[in-house]
Amino acid sequence: ITLPDRELACAPIDSPLGQEYLGAMRAAINCALANRQIVTHLVRQAFAEILPHADLSLMYDVSHNTCKVEEHRVGNQSRRLFVHRKGATRAFGPGHPDIPPDLQTIGQPVLIGGTMGTASYLLVGTAESMNMAYGSACHGAGRSMSRHQATRQWKGGKVIDDLAKEGILIRSPSKRGVAEEAPGAYKDVTAVVDAAEAAQLARKVAKMRPLICIKG
């Protein structure tokens, strides 16, 4: 394959290498899903020790940074496509057959996490997103600087103290990790969410502020 740029390296889907890539990616998605299930179980156990009758039900679980085989309208035809979502997640609109029955009339939940010090958002996919972006929306604001740059600008201990003054508790074994994830190292999540809604890629449902943040 002749490439106009080495960054566009690719492999035909039906080639052995292409199939190996898809298999490895799907294994990674399954690993991440299993990891989230384990974290959910541990959180439920922790809550049960203090609030034995608490019911922590899972609202939704969704993967991002994936490539999935989907049916979409291209022009006047329905086509089977491999949809790559990098820095993005599914945002299927109401009535899509891949949405769970209890969410069919609403649309697919879109979870957009903020930083340790900013809001996170719950959105839902739209019919317009299906037409414009193959049912896709952002899954976060994205970094405004590298982790290395963040550690040069912030100290983990100072970040923890500043967030504590705002009523946000941070728990992390690594102060360097906290510095890498400093709120200032990310773009404005509210501006990103507003832009996604203005573009009709997703619709805002709820805004949530952090109380406790656990960094691995």
Across the structure, where does each feature detected by a protein language model lie?
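Domain-length cofactor-binding catalytic modules of enzymes
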Residues: 1-216
